[in-house]
Amino acid sequence: MKVVDLFAGCGGLSLGFQNAGYEIAAAYDFWLPAVNVYRENFTSHSIYQMDLSDTEAAVRHIMPFAPDMIIG
């Protein structure tokens, strides 16, 4: 099952879902220090620094990943 993680922070939730067998397609966070730590923790997928308050832009960015589930 393909998952996108919103407000991902350093990746704790992503790690839990990954360990449970889910495929993390992408992650999003706005805070640059968290994004940098996430990038160090995960190399199998991208994290995007993005303000998700613009919901239309966020949906346009997330939908190409075709997630089965959005977590965060």
Predicted regions and their residues:
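Conserved active-site and SAM-binding loop architecture
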Residues: 1-72
